[in-house]
Amino acid sequence: MKRRSLLSMIPAASALLALRSNGAPITKPTLNDAGFAVSVQCWSFKEFTLFQAIEMAAAAGASGVEVYKGQKLGGDHGDVTFGPEIADDKLQAIIEHLKKNNIVALNFGVVDVPKDEAKARQIFEIAKKLNLYGITTESLGSLDILEKLAKEYNIKVCFHNHPKPTSLWNPENTLKSLEGRHENIGFCADIGHLASSALDPLTVVKKIAPRIHSFHLKDRASLTEWTHDQPFGTGVIDIPGILDEARKAGFAGNVSIEYEHNWKTNLPEVAQCVGYLKAYSKLRA
């Protein structure tokens, strides 16, 4: 396995939240110089509380987080977990903790969105209260209600791929279902899961780039089978090429680092990934 150097491949919470309306384009200082946001999927820190995950994302140098349903808040809130049913006072505590750490909540997922409009609307309401950019889901069967609410709330819907044999394992198949749909409907391209499904991530991204709203970005040792996550630039996935292709198609969304390895001690590795993306951003500015 060859380590790749970025340089060899080349010819930035309410104060922050107030900079954009819910679902509107992400703006500076959350956007980096290359025009996208760098966040950490809180699932990377699933062994910790949400408050700790926010602190760890900040320590790693990220500008945002992607929250998921079921993580304990921690602190004075004990075993209370995050989700669409969370009480307003708990939600306000999260917002204040984000602000304290100069972190923006950008996406919520991966979350199931039901066809029932009232229940689906509850998810969009929590996204609105958190001023989120997008909702990450695999509920393709709820596409009609997702499209309706994505337009109403001006929030991106990002269809995520888990590995084969899950239903959305191949984004090229999902793309057919998105033809003619509103521009807020698109993808959260999980790069590591593409590799686990023996799909070349760069090839897939080239085909779906105009619909990509967010990433779950990973580096791996193989493009044909499951291998564990590792710091960006130490594996075989062409991360600069993937980001270049997305940016060519106008990508200005959320790049969420999802690091599913060394669960209790992965902060230094997540920080390496953030640093890699910062270097990419500077070189592409």
Question: How would you describe each model-predicted region?
Answer:
Residues 67-92:
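Glycine-rich, proline-tolerant flexible connector loops at the mouths of alpha/beta enzymes
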Residues 41-43, 68, 109-111, 138-141, ...:
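Active-site-proximal beta-strand/loop segments in catalytic clefts of secreted hydrolases
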Residues 38-48, 107-116:
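Active-site mouth loops of central-metabolism enzymes
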